[in-house]
């Protein structure tokens, strides 16, 4: 069972993408996106500027993961990450991982698990130890900037990456 929704945007009706996602929900197992919890990360259930409800679960929002053919699940590292998680999102941890939690994350990565790590430079203290394993560190500066010459999409705006020099 699935739903073909109308959306809270200027188009209202589903496009081919949303119709296809609804059909896929009927005939196949959808990719599952896990969001790490337990360390003060951005919340997938709360509605707010700093949380991810709109991006994950919001049914009237056309571009939510739910409407684009993904299942979403919260993941706690106190136990091994389920094998059906296709990508794990770590969104701005505010406390460090315990050794057993780190082991569970390492096991997920070792079996080929995918990660998406999101952070702001002021979270360096907790994020840098995790990022260091991948040869990455947080540095001050802007790496995403909206440009006036790019037309805005009515429902979603995509920033462009820029070099630190601004060119």
Model-predicted regions and their roles:
Residues 1-167:
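Short, surface-exposed patches at the edges or C-terminal ends of soluble domains, predominantly
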């Amino acid at each position: 069972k699935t739903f073909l929704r109308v959306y809270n945007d200027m188009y209202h009706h589903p496009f081919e993408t949303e119709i296809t996602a609804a059909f896929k929900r009927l005939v196949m197992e959808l990719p599952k996106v896990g969001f790490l919890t337990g360390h003060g990360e951005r919340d997938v259930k709360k509605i707010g500027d700093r949380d991810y409800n709109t991006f994950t679960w919001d049914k009237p929002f056309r571009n939510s993961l739910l409407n684009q053919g993904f299942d979403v699940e919260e993941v706690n590292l106190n136990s091994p990450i389920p094998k059906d998680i296709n990508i794990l999102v770590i969104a701005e941890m505010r406390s460090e991982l315990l050794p057993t939690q780190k082991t569970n994350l390492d096991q997920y990565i070792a079996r080929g698990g995918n990660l998406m790590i999101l952070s702001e430079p002021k979270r360096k203290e907790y994020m840098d130890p995790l990022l260091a394993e991948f040869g990455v560190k947080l540095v001050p500066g802007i790496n995403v900037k909206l440009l006036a010459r790019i037309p805005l999409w009515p429902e979603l705006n995509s920033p462009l990456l820029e070099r630190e020099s601004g060119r």
